[in-house]
Amino acid sequence: MSDTLAQLADVLAARRHADPESSYVAKLHAKGLNKILEKVGEEATETLLAAKDAEHGDDATRQAVVAETADLWFHSLVMLSHLDIDHQAVLDELARRFGVSGLDEKAARQSR
């Protein structure tokens, strides 16, 4: 998984400063963080709706969850790129949480 994310991050970095007329990623960056966040929110909502439909759905509705989640991850990576946060920081944070009870991890965050 991280190889695919690394490849995508490289493509996003290359397209960040491309011509907004020829690159969707460059166009998002040119429109600024608020537009990127709008897209992340939109894709999050679409993912939630697809998941709700898929709960008792068929393979097509389950595939819609996969497609919408891919859109959400993509736009989240664009957001990270815009903020100059390497996707590896997120992967490192997930790795750090392995072996830690979810309840303990949540309690530690709340005590900060």
UniProtKB/Swiss-Prot annotation:
Gene Ontology CC: one annotated term: cytoplasm
Reaction(s) catalysed (UniProt annotation): 1-(5-phospho-beta-D-ribosyl)-ATP + H2O = 1-(5-phospho-beta-D-ribosyl)-5'-AMP + diphosphate + H(+)
Gene3D superfamilies, A to Z: MazG-like
Alphabetical list of InterPro entries matching this protein: HisE, PRib-ATP_PPHydrolase-like
One BP term from GO: L-histidine biosynthetic process
Lineage top rank: taxon: Bacteria
Keyword annotations from UniProtKB, A to Z: Amino-acid biosynthesis, ATP-binding, Cytoplasm, Histidine biosynthesis, Hydrolase, Nucleotide-binding
Main localization category: cytoplasm
Localization per record: Cytoplasm
Pathway: Amino-acid biosynthesis; L-histidine biosynthesis; L-histidine from 5-phospho-alpha-D-ribose 1-diphosphate: step 2/9
GO molecular function: ATP binding; phosphoribosyl-ATP diphosphatase activity
EC number(s) from the headed UniProt entry: 3.6.1.31
Pfam families for the chain: PRA-PH
Protein family: Belongs to the PRA-PH family.
Protein name: Phosphoribosyl-ATP pyrophosphatase
